[in-house]
Amino acid sequence: MPSKQSNVTWVTDRLAVGHAPMSHAELDALKSEGIDAIMNLCAEFCDLHEIQRQAGFEVYYMPVVDEEAPEMKELEQALSWLDEAVYLGKKVLIHCRHGIGRTGTVLNAYLLRRGLGHKLAGRKLKNMRSKPANFEQWWTIRRYGKKEGRLTIREPSLEMKNLVDLAPFLEDYAGLSGRVED
């Protein structure tokens, strides 16, 4: 459902999609929504990602030309970043200029990565503005879906449940590595 405050649509409580923020007021509205990380897909705005960083957001910049789709390797790297950001509890916005085709392509690939399969992903995107908008984008999703496969061991989900607190492990590791270096 679109947020009235910043014109983003929340896919989950940690993942939103929308158009490129084109003013400091829109960036402030994103902050007030709790968004702290942005995946910027805009190739047409060469400095927008820097403005977003300066505004205090963590930014993953993957420039994709309008009406095109990312290369499979770039898509995989972007989805790995997105998985990590969501796992770490960050609220992430995925955007291109208008929040439609490129945004929808990456979102659809993320749904497939989370195990939803083409049918469930299609149902999730059905009433959303963000979805692949042309043949190249749909073809990329089809290829990605074949590569990724479908989850059969557990129920697919977009929610990150049972997050693991790594702090005790990291503290032990720091202590051990300190002893080894001495």
Pin down the residues of each PLM region:
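Cysteine-based protein phosphatase catalytic domain of the PTP/DSP
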Residues: 4-91, 112-114, 118-139
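Cysteine-dependent PTP/DSP-like catalytic domain, specifically the C-terminal lobe
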Residues: 88, 106-171
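Conserved G/P- and acidic residue-centered "switch" motifs that form tight phosphate/ATP-binding loops
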Residues: 99
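Ser/Thr-glycine-rich phosphate-binding loops at phosphate-binding pockets of nucleotides
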Residues: 103
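Secreted peptidase-domain scaffold signal
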Residues: 180-182
